[in-house]
Regions:
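Conserved SAM-binding loop of SAM-dependent methyltransferases across substrates and taxa
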Residues: 98-108
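Conserved SAM-binding strand-loop segment of SAM-dependent methyltransferases
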Residues: 126-139
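Conserved SAM/SAH-binding beta-strand->alpha-helix loop
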Residues: 116-118
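Conserved SAM-binding motif I beta-strand of class I
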Residues: 109-114
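Conserved alpha-helix/loop element of class I SAM-dependent methyltransferases that forms part
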Residues: 70-88
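N-terminal juxtadomain amphipathic helix
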Residues: 1-69
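Conserved class I S-adenosyl-L-methionine
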Residues: 87-97
Length: 139
């Protein structure tokens, strides 16, 4: 049983910036109902109406997490704690963005999955194996 607990109404999709703002383009812009549900059976929080990955994760995804000093510091701190506590021989990061987290790991000990090809190219150029795919059971 899923219970809606937060309704943020209709929102434009992330990173879908309009290059030419007019009444016509605004009418064509994709909006979706952004509401959050709690699954009482599994104790999971998720979007009530997930957006198609193909629509959301494009080759022009603009947000780059490493441009934030706070994100860099936070991910470095988390990576160091995880490495100290678990001493992983290998790691997988799903949704690596531009490599803000994985850059704190040895290139031989981590693989990334990033559905936005422009971001996956960045981490590949840094020398990390990054799959330019959406994480699903086929991958």
């Amino acid at each position: 049983m899923k219970e809606k607990f937060l309704n943020l109404l209709k929102k434009p999709i992330t990173n879908s910036y309009l290059s030419n703002i007019s009444k016509k383009t605004i009418k064509k812009e994709f909006f979706y109902n952004l509401s959050v549900v709690f699954d009482k059976k599994n104790y999971l929080v998720s979007l009530a109406n997930p957006i198609s990955p193909k629509k959301q994760y494009t080759s022009k995804y603009a947000h780059r997490a490493s441009q934030s000093i706070t994100m860099n510091q936070s991910f470095k701190k988390i990576a160091l704690k995880l490495q100290k506590k678990f001493k992983p021989s290998f790691s997988l990061e799903i949704g690596s963005n531009d490599g803000v987290f994985i850059k704190n790991f040895s290139k031989k000990k981590i693989i990334a999955v990033e559905p936005c090809s422009n971001l996956a190219r960045i981490t590949n150029k840094l020398g990390y194996v990054t799959y330019d795919k959406f994480w699903n059971k086929e991958l």
